[in-house]
Regions:
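Helix-to-loop junction immediately C-terminal to a conserved catalytic motif
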Residues: 51
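H-loop/switch region of ABC-family ATPase nucleotide-binding domains
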Residues: 202-203
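Conserved ABC ATPase "signature" region
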Residues: 116-137, 185
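Catalytic Walker B motif of ABC-type/P-loop ATPase nucleotide-binding domains
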Residues: 166-169
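A short, surface-exposed alpha-helical micro-motif characterized by mixed small hydrophobic
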Residues: 208-210
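The feature captures the beta-strand-to-loop junction immediately N-terminal to the Walker
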Residues: 36-38
Length: 255
């Protein structure tokens, strides 16, 4: 596989709690990889290490063949690694356009590498807000947004650096059916039109089956299964249980 991202032997502890125990995970160019596991399995910690939000105790992160293990989160963002968070938007007091502008300025080198000049900042902002369906809410403070609009804001901020890889942490959780469908369509368009790779963290096997090329299942800080999305429920008991529960109730569990 032509790996865009390779995380090798990643270990992380918080005090005496060993969260990750030598995980290795790869994402190919243009690939959508699902990351499945129960609460506390280390999914979010792994994403935070890949994005540079936290550093590993041991292991190495390579992105486009370059060792980025000690790079800051801002530097990785400029290099093309973006992340959305389970609890959206770090700037609740900013308006939508202000929040996206912060991300766009942070990603300025990547934006210019894509052929944009500084004078096009406002045009780029408008384009991002139109693409993510937030133009009408551009002057709203983030604290006033619905859950669906907050997820859109996370997407707008993430794609502002023209990323090669986006880490999506439970981005489809706690959404209405309409919001989920629209965000799925946005993700697919970004994948199809821009060739963006995704690492999609979800406790919902139906979402993983629908969107992913491959799924990696982790538990207790280790990879214990990897394969085709359609085989997840056959080999992973937690996925089989979740699959049946969602089929019966139409609801997602907490994950």
């Amino acid at each position: 596989m032509n790996d865009l991202l390779l995380a090798e032997g990643i270990a992380k502890s918080f005090g005496t709690n060993r969260v990750l125990r030598g995980i290795t995970l790869a994402v190919g160019r243009g690939e959508v990889v699902g990351l499945f596991g129960p609460n506390g399995s280390g999914k979010t910690t792994l994403a935070n290490i890949i994005s540079g939000l936290i550093l590993p105790d041991r292991g190495r992160i390579r992105f486009e063949g370059k060792d980025v293990t000690r790079m800051t989160m801002d530097a990785r963002f400029r290099a093309g690694i973006a992340q959305t968070f389970q609890i959206p938007d770090p700037y609740p007091s900013l308006t939508v356009v202000e929040s996206v502008r912060v991300a766009l300025l942070c990603g300025q080198p990547a934006r210019q590498a894509g052929g944009k000049e500084k004078g096009g900042l406002e045009e780029e902002l408008d384009s991002l807000l139109l693409r993510t369906g937030l133009f009408a809410q551009r002057f709203w403070p983030a604290a006033k947004l619905s859950q669906g609009c907050l997820r859109r804001l996370e997407f707008a901020r993430a794609i502002s650096c023209r990323p090669r890889l986006i880490l999506l942490d439970e981005v489809f959780s706690a959404l209405s059916a309409r919001d989920e469908a629209e965000l799925v369509a946005l993700m697919r368009a970004l994948h199809r039109e821009a060739g963006i790779s995704f690492l999609l963290i979800s406790h919902n096997p139906l979402i993983l089956e629908e969107l992913c090329d491959r799924v990696v299942a982790i538990e207790d800080g280790r990879v214990f299964w990897e394969g085709r999305p359609g085989d997840l429920a056959k080999y992973v008991p937690a996925a089989n249980h979740a699959h049946g529960h969602e089929a019966e109730t139409g609801e997602e569990g907490q994950g």
